[in-house]
Amino acid sequence: MIYGTGIDLTELSRIEAILAKGLRLPEKILTPAELAVFSRYPVKRQIEFMAGRFSAKEAYSKAYGTGIGAAVGFQDIEILDNAQGKPEVTRHPFDGPAWISISHTDTLVMTQVILERGNL
C-alpha cells in the first residue's frame, strides 16, 4: 500500500549560485557517504548531484508527510547509487521501502519518492 508520495523540482542555477558563494550547503544536505561521492565529481556534475540529492530529500519529506524540519532532516535521509547506477534510499526514518526517481534536464532536476507500507 502506498503510504505517501512526494515530488520536487529544483533549478540547477539556484544550487550553482549557492555553491559559487562558498556556502556550506553540501555539508548541511549530504551525509558523509554522499559527500564522498560528491567530492569526486567535476564542478558541473557536483551541481547536478547536489541538486538531485536536495530535491530527492525534499520529495522524501513530502511523502513522509512532515516536510524538512524537526521530524526529519536532510541528514536522516541517505541516497546512494547501487551497482547499476540507480539511486536508492539507503537510510531513512520510514519503516517501509522508499522508491526514488531522479531526472535531470539542462536546467532542472525533478524527483519523485514513493513510500510503501505492506503489500501493494
Swiss-Prot record:
Transmembrane intervals: none
Record lineage: Bacteria, Bacillati, Bacillota, Bacilli, Lactobacillales
Cofactor: Mg(2+)
Key words of the record: Cytoplasm, Fatty acid biosynthesis, Fatty acid metabolism, Lipid biosynthesis, Lipid metabolism, Magnesium, Metal-binding, Transferase
Location(s) in or outside the cell: Cytoplasm
EC annotation from Swiss-Prot or TrEMBL: 2.7.8.7
Role noted for this protein: Transfers the 4'-phosphopantetheine moiety from coenzyme A to a Ser of acyl-carrier-protein.
GO cellular component, as recorded: cytoplasm
Annotated catalysed reactions: apo-[ACP] + CoA = holo-[ACP] + adenosine 3',5'-bisphosphate + H(+)
Molecular-function annotations in GO: holo-[acyl-carrier-protein] synthase activity; magnesium ion binding
InterPro entries cross-referenced by the UniProt entry: 4-PPantetheinyl_Trfase_dom, 4-PPantetheinyl_Trfase_dom_sf, ACPS, Ppantetheine-prot_Trfase_dom
Root EC class: transferase
Protein's name in the database: Holo-[acyl-carrier-protein] synthase
GO biological process terms on file: fatty acid biosynthetic process
Similarity field: Belongs to the P-Pant transferase superfamily. AcpS family.
Gene3D superfamilies listed in its UniProt record: 4'-phosphopantetheinyl transferase domain
Keyword Membrane: no
UniProt organism field: Lactiplantibacillus plantarum (strain ATCC BAA-793 / NCIMB 8826 / WCFS1)
Residues noted as binding Mg(2+) in the record, renumbered to the chain: D8, E58
